[in-house]
Amino acid sequence: MTSRLRLPDRLLAIDRALADAGFEHAFGGAIALAYWTLDPRGTSDIDVNVFIPAARCEEALAALPEDIAWSEADVAAIKRDGQVRVWWEEIPVDLFFDYVELHADAARNRRTVPFEGVEIPILGPIELATFKAMFDRTRDWADIEAMLEAETLDAQAVRENLLALIGEGDRRVQRLDETVARA
C-alpha cells in the first residue's frame, strides 16, 4: 500500500499509534532540534525514543502503523543494540529503546510542544544533545553548537551525562568542551 503521506503526517500517525497503545515516547532528531535551536532544518527521517526496555520491543513494533516494515532481524538488532532503523516506504524511522539510565532521564525530561495543530512529545535539550554527542557525527556537533548559541542547553549537564556514559578519557567529552568554548 502506498500512502504518500507527508513526513509530518507520518510522525503524527506514529505518535497516535504509540500513545493509543500506552507507550511513552518522544521524538528526537531534527524535529526536537527545531524547538531547541529555534531554527528548524529539513529532515527526511523520523527519530523516536520508545521508553520501554529493548526486550519488549515487539510490543511497540506491533503498535506502529501497519505500513512500517519490520522483521525478526530488526527485533534482534533492537535487543542487541537498543535501536534500529525501519522503513515506512521511503521514510526511515529510527527507533530507540531503553538500554542505559539516560533513557529514564529522557522519559522524565521530555517536553510537549505544538506540532501541526496538536501536541507531541519531544526529547528535552540535555538528552537530545547527549544522544547527539554519543553519535559523534559532524552534523550532530553543529546541532549542539546551534543549541548552545540559542541558549537552550545546559552544557555542564550534557558533560556530566557523557562522563557517566563514557568516562573522562573519551574524545567526545573533549569535543564537547571544544564546542562549548567555540559557542
Regions found by a protein language model. Name each.
Residues 1-183:
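Compositionally biased terminal segments of proteins
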